[in-house]
Amino acid sequence: MADTQCCPPPCEFISSAGTDLALGMGWDATLCLLPFTGFGKCAGIWNHMDEEPDNGDDRGSRRTTGQGRKWAAHGTMAAPRVHTDYHPGGGSACSSVKVRSHVGHTGVFFFVDQDPLAVSLTSQSLIPPLIKPGLLKAWGFLLLCAQPSANGHSLCCLLYTDLVSSHELSPFRALCLGPSDAPSACASCNCLASTYYL
């Protein structure tokens, strides 16, 4: 756990999600995302992913929408992308996400409860620091979301590491996903990155 006392207001985190990934030929991980009010969208950032028709076979793939499409790991050097799904009635439809992947095929799923944040996630400028095809061997993820600010925007800190093994602890790096009117909260992302370990 992180020492959240070092985080200044409004860094009041109410949701978190994470994975434990180990170097190897492949891994299975379940992201258990704790729900909070206002869920309406599930978002994912993927690397090395191809889309294929739903043929009823879940091996090497993960159903995202329940509408006949999957995101499957094939090892191709596809461009990094952001994929978002709407889930009527809230985010409970993907509150637990099972991912099967292999080394070099990584993704992170998380909920966002405000459209402005979801829109910002589709910006290509956010992707290069997170996903570098051909470089990453395994990733660990942790997403922390704060209470929405006065203008209705949520703040999330995406903590990640690209050096994960079962024999060492790797400190997280941080990326602030939030409005520009919350500089103090964004600064707390760096604080969290220095205190969280996978």
From Swiss-Prot:
Residues 51-74 are annotated as: Disordered. This is Putative uncharacterized protein encoded by AGPAT4-IT1. It comes from Homo sapiens (Human). The lineage of its organism: Eukaryota, Metazoa, Chordata, Craniata, Vertebrata.
